[in-house]
Amino acid sequence: MPAALVENSQVICEVWASNLEEEMRKIREIVLSYSYIAMDTEFPGVVVRPIGEFRSSIDYQYQLLRCNVDLLKIIQLGLTFTNEKGEYPSGINTWQFNFKFNLTEDMYSQDSIDLLANSGLQFQKHEEEGIDTLHFAELLMTSGVVLCDNVKWLSFHSGYDFGYMVKLLTDSRLPEEEHEFFHILNLFFPSIYDVKYLMKSCKNLKGGLQEVADQLDLQRIGRQHQAGSDSLLTGMAFFRMKELFFEDSIDDAKYCGRLYGLGTGVAQKQNEDVDCAQEKMSILAMINNMQQ
């Protein structure tokens, strides 16, 4: 049984504007030895539907994602760190980042906000003490968490999660075409394993994250629909599934870089791979200049 299933030493750290830089310094050290990162976001729902003609249902799903991510703001991000065996660092292993969000000024789905409020999110505190996304993006760029081939990202049905991450890191709207989105995604997050996509090869596993956790006999730490708790549970599910269904070895060619409900993701042209490498070098040079 992977150590990721041992609950007694797991700790979720709440991060607000006041302790952001201190916690990011810790993460820069942690990721050197614990480079498997389970991720989840909380966002204010779906508020618009795209109109027009679409090439396929997958194209429609991407356009639905794109128009909502462009309009809305991320509320929470959860990151849980383990090593390749599913073992946690001592002490804190999960960070829950709470971003600025204003119920008076920002757009949202009322049902989603009600769900998050009932799950314990403190929207008044988000408004007053939340993290500025631009400042967070600057710190994330230099954290060793993104743009690194050795870092493995674990997620669950994560098109929207990574949509918000790409928006946050680029400070711009998502690309109009899905293949352009995956090009940028693979630049920042070279290795992604979406647990919901992995479930396609896991007999009898079905449902959302909590249902899957129940089927795998996993115990949640923290509250459902909070990003830290959900990221922690996502990591647990990945390592349990890896052990039970994949004999502790997942075929990257089949699963890496694919997001459930969207296109193939990794089906990039070779010349795009060259462009991606050149873009990464440019970004790394920019980061190096920022650190000097």
UniProtKB/Swiss-Prot annotation:
Biological processes annotated in GO: miRNA-mediated gene silencing by mRNA destabilization; positive regulation of cell population proliferation; regulation of translation
Gene: Cnot8
Subcellular location: Cytoplasm; Nucleus
Protein name as annotated: CCR4-NOT transcription complex subunit 8
Reaction it catalyzes: Exonucleolytic cleavage of poly(A) to 5'-AMP
Keyword Chloroplast attached: no
Any one GO molecular function term: 3'-5'-RNA exonuclease activity
Top-rank taxon, per record: Eukaryota
Quaternary assembly: Component of the CCR4-NOT complex; distinct complexes seem to exist that differ in the participation of probably mutually exclusive catalytic subunits; the complex contains two deadenylase subunits, CNOT6 or CNOT6L, and CNOT7 or CNOT8. In the complex interacts directly with CNOT1. Interacts with BTG1, BTG2 and TOB1. Interacts with BTG4.
UniProt entry tagged with the keyword Transferase: no
EC number: 3.1.13.4
UniProt family annotation: Belongs to the CAF1 family.
UniProt keyword terms in alphabetical order: Cytoplasm, Exonuclease, Hydrolase, Metal-binding, Nuclease, Nucleus, Repressor, RNA-binding, RNA-mediated gene silencing, Transcription, Transcription regulation, Translation regulation
GO CC annotations, alphabetized: CCR4-NOT complex; cytosol; nucleus
Binding-site residues for a divalent metal cation 2, renumbered to this chain: 40, 42, 230
EC class name: hydrolase
Annotated positions binding a divalent metal cation 1: 40, 161
Origin species: Mus musculus (Mouse)
Its biological purpose: Has 3'-5' poly(A) exoribonuclease activity for synthetic poly(A) RNA substrate. Its function seems to be partially redundant with that of CNOT7. Catalytic component of the CCR4-NOT complex which is linked to various cellular processes including bulk mRNA degradation, miRNA-mediated repression, translational repression during translational initiation and general transcription regulation. During miRNA-mediated repression the complex also seems to act as translational repressor during translational initiation. Additional complex functions may be a consequence of its influence on mRNA expression.
